[in-house]
């Protein structure tokens, strides 16, 4: 229930209050470094920001449309809840080992795997409209988002010096959440006007962009 969220929020507040961050260096406190435009033109920044933005944008585009699409396909509320529960598991459960995968196989390989998982999600989604089609598609979508988001933000740390950290991360967050907001705005409109299959097809160029970045 909504009341339980109060308890979760209080626990989160207590944990956050107990955190102790290392003090910032002088360069971090006063900023400086290269102009933001120069940082953003680096290939490493482009790949990192693009991966995170595509991960968030495509995930949000398809996830937000899923309840409507499943309703249009005659699937019930319980089916929708089941699919979205597993989607959320796919989003966050891999976080326990994504860092280890990055350390072992390299961040670029993890990003590539995330893009391939999103591509697999689309392939499954356009093949049919049964419960299992939605379940597999949304599960893979969640795992793909995890790899692209964590991989992208990990790679981003190679794009800046300590004095440039705040503005570089700020730009990355802006691009990422701009993609998220845009996909949220168009998701419902597209699935109701064009359909679930077309919505997935629209996501293909963005996923391809992250694959070949």
What kind of region is each of these model predictions?
Residues 1-6, 189-207:
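A membrane-interface helix-boundary motif in multi-pass transporters
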Residues 6-26, 213:
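C-terminal membrane-cytosol helix-exit motif in multi-pass small-molecule transporters
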Residues 21-48:
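Juxtamembrane intracellular "pre-TM" segments in multi-pass secondary transporters
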Residues 41-61, 139:
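Pair of pore-lining "gating" transmembrane helices in MFS-fold secondary transporters
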Residues 93-107, 191:
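Helix-to-loop junctions at the C-terminal end of transmembrane segments
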Residues 109-124, 204:
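Structural signature of the two symmetry-related core transmembrane helices
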Residues 147-161:
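Intracellular juxtamembrane helix-capping segments at the cytosolic ends
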Residues 159, 164-193:
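A late C-terminal transmembrane helix in Major Facilitator Superfamily
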């Amino acid at each position: 229930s909504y009341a339980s969220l109060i308890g979760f929020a209080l626990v989160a507040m207590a944990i956050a209050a107990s955190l102790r961050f290392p003090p910032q260096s002088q360069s971090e406190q006063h900023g400086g470094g290269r102009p933001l435009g120069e940082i953003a033109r680096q290939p490493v920044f482009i790949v990192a920001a693009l991966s995170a933005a595509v991960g968030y944008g495509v995930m949000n585009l398809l996830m937000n449309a899923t309840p409507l699409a499943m309703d249009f396909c005659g699937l019930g509320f319980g089916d929708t809840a089941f699919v979205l529960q597993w989607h959320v598991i796919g989003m966050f459960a891999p976080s326990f080992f994504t860092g280890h995968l990055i350390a072992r196989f390299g961040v670029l390989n993890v990003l590539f795997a995330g893009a391939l998982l999103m591509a697999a999600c689309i392939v499954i989604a356009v093949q049919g409209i049964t419960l299992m089609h939605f379940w597999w598609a949304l599960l893979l979508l969640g795992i793909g988002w995890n790899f692209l988001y964590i991989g992208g933000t990990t790679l981003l740390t190679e794009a800046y010096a300590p004095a440039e950290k705040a503005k570089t991360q700020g730009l990355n967050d802006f691009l990422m959440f701009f993609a998220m907001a845009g996909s949220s705005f168009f998701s419902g409109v597209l699935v109701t006007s064009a359909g679930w299959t077309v919505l997935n097809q629209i996501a293909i160029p963005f996923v391809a962009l992250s694959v070949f970045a």
